[in-house]
Amino acid sequence: MSKIIIATANKGKAKEFEKIFAKFNIEVATLADFPEIGEIEETGTTFAENAALKAETVASLLNQTVIADDSGLIVDVLNGAPGVYSARYAGVAHDDAKNNEKLLKNLEGVEPAKRTARFHCTLAVATPSEKTSFYTGEVEGVIAEQLCGTNGFGYDPLFFLPEFGLTMAEIPAEKKNEISHRANAIKQLEKDLAEVVEKVTKK
């Protein structure tokens, strides 16, 4: 069976890709399957740079086609922050509570109409000796004034979706997987899926 590598240790992300490639009889592996690689430091200044860094590094090490994503929250009134620093906005990587607390503090006194934001995702598909391909997806919303909901992770409890009248952490997981920034990026990837599958199966 052919295999594609997803440059993440996040099981949730891996499952999204497993659904896509299962119909092509392509197995999905993640960085959890390659502990010797270790964590890849995200030193880029854009989502695309970070996604490419992860995908190209792993593709080179394993000599296989690799997909990586970099995603984050963009708040307009904060000039795009936290952006590529979303996971470590409060200075501690992946501390959701501290990140949300800092975001709320930085938005104190900002009226609802000016709390517009979006989640962004860039996917990078890297194959050794070939040009890296990129796919992007976004979902628009507003930053709420307090945490609501227990589903999801990260900034989901603060990301209010006017269309649904709920935060991303209040909608069912199935719906989130349909409308999220990552889901929208994957939809773009699916348009070129035949090409990606060819890269994997010809190895």
From Swiss-Prot:
Catalytic-site annotation from UniProt: 70
Residue sites binding Mg(2+) per the record: 41, 70
GO biological process, one term: nucleotide metabolic process
Keyword Hydrolase: yes
Binding site for substrate: 8-13, 71, 153-156, 176, 181-182
Keyword field: Hydrolase, Magnesium, Metal-binding, Nucleotide metabolism, Nucleotide-binding
Record Pfam families: Ham1p_like
Biological role stated in the UniProt entry: Pyrophosphatase that catalyzes the hydrolysis of nucleoside triphosphates to their monophosphate derivatives, with a high preference for the non-canonical purine nucleotides XTP (xanthosine triphosphate), dITP (deoxyinosine triphosphate) and ITP. Seems to function as a house-cleaning enzyme that removes non-canonical purine nucleotides from the nucleotide pool, thus preventing their incorporation into DNA/RNA and avoiding chromosomal lesions.
NCBIfam families per record: PRK14822.1, RdgB/HAM1 family non-canonical purine NTP pyrophosphatase
The protein's name in its UniProt record: dITP/XTP pyrophosphatase
Organism: Listeria innocua serovar 6a (strain ATCC BAA-680 / CLIP 11262)
